[in-house]
Amino acid sequence: MRHGFLVAGLAAALMLTSCGGKDDVQGKTGEDITAKSSASDIGEAYINEMTRIADALETVDDEASAKAAAKKIQVAVDGLNQMSEELDGEISGVKGMQIFGGRYAELVQVQGRIATSMIRIQSDHPELMDTISAEMDRMEN
């Protein structure tokens, strides 16, 4: 049941956080974001970090891949959390529309990928959820 809440919480958590290394990401990441960053840069970084999470989750099918995915998720969650702290954790409705308005389709797509992967892992490999959840639970709302 806790994992069901995790999936729901993840969708709700999509109101901002982000950072991490650029090792596997093209464009902005959470480490690039400051309080002075443009809405466009914030949106790009957020979607890039969430894409990193989605990509990692899609690889999970055994204990080794779950551990590898958890390391990638850790980097993305660190980035999301750093971005949230840099932006004081609050984005007004207007600012949120500026950030995600033009990228709404991308945002919905990456959220769907994450939710689908979490459901698949929970259904097919419930024993791997603790490994994944340990990192996902660190995401600040």
What are these regions (language model features)?
Residues 9, 35-36, 94:
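Alpha-helical interaction segments
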Residues 15-18:
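C-terminal motif of bacterial Sec signal peptides marking the signal peptidase cleavage site
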Residues 7-13:
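Classic N-terminal secretory signal peptides
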